[in-house]
Every structure is written in structure tokens, then in C-alpha cells.
Amino acid sequence: MKNVLKSVIVLLAIFVVGTLQAQDASKALKQGDKVKDFTLKNAKGEEVNLSVLLKKGPVVLTWYRGGWCPYCNLALKQLQEELAQIKEQGATLVALTPELPDHSLTTQEKNALEFEVLTDLHNEVARSYGLVFKLDPQTAERYESMLHLSAHNGTDSSELPIPATYVVDTDGTIRYAYVNPDYKQRADAKTVVEELKKLK
């Protein structure tokens, strides 16, 4: 009981103080842009290449901050609920996170996710998509002391991805883009399915 109470207090402290950061989404890739190719490892250490996935069909890319974020977990669960519909459209769903594989695997298992979760080490891919922001010093200190963010991500840069979801056509064109600096707002999973249906 004490551990549960402690966890609740920690999360409340983080999400009350760590509200909206100065996240600039103006540089993020948008609808109509071409995606940047990448190769990242999944939670099992296997390499996954975007171009290879696009040869099979459309791809849904979704970024989340980490398994420690309740809003991220909720968004991932909602996508999991729509996974059958996503696959029915011939699409592949891929989640990207700066967390190290051990932590991304925990998130995948905790939420019973049946889609790929890739480690975007040092936010390199997120950066190329214009989705990286830096925590302010006060928030970074709280995240580190309460969540040990550097241990989760393998870096002390205090950078996180802006939560975003893209529907990418087979030619690499972004047909739907949802990028919101407010981490409490995420793309609706059912909307993602509807956007995929438009590609046919």
C-alpha cells in the first residue's frame, strides 16, 4: 500500500509541476512531407527498417515519451485495441521511444502490445522528424530524481520526443499527422484507422 501511495504522489508531483514545456512543434514533419528512413532495434534487439515495412503496406508511426508516462500507456493501449483494424488495412503499427530496450520491453509486456516498440536512442529519429524538445532545468531535475530518466533513456540530455502519430503511405508520404505539444492529448486510434481507409 505504501508503494502504491508513493507512486501516486510521485506521478502527481511530476505532472503538476511538469506541465507544458516550451515544445516547438513548428519544425515537425507534417502532412504531405516525405518521411526520413531509419533502422532501429526492437525490444528483442532485432533491427527494423522503415523502408522494408513500407514495401509491405502503409505504416503508422507513433512516438511516446516512456513507459513511466500514464498518458503514453493509455494511448498505446488504445492503439492495441485498434490493431486488428489497422492490420485489416494492410498497415503496420510501430511505436518509437527513447527508452532503452529493457524498459521498452517492460512497457510492451505491461500493456500486452502486439506491435513493434523500437528504441530511438538519443532521440535521433525523432530529431530528424522535428519532434525533440528539452526539459527545462527544474522539470528535468524532478524527472531525474523521481523517475531516473537518464537510466531509462541511457543519456543525461533531458530530451524527450513530442508525442506524435503519422500515417505514412507506401511511397513514404505522410497522409495524416498528429503532433501536439500537450502530452495529455494524443491521436485518436479510431481516427488513425479511418485515415488508413482513405489510402485505399
What name fits each language-model region?
Residues 183-198:
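A short, polar/charged loop-to-alpha-helix boundary motif
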Residues 120-184:
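Thiol/selenol-based redox catalytic cores and closely related redox-interacting motifs
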Residues 1-9:
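Bacterial N-terminal signal peptides that target proteins for export
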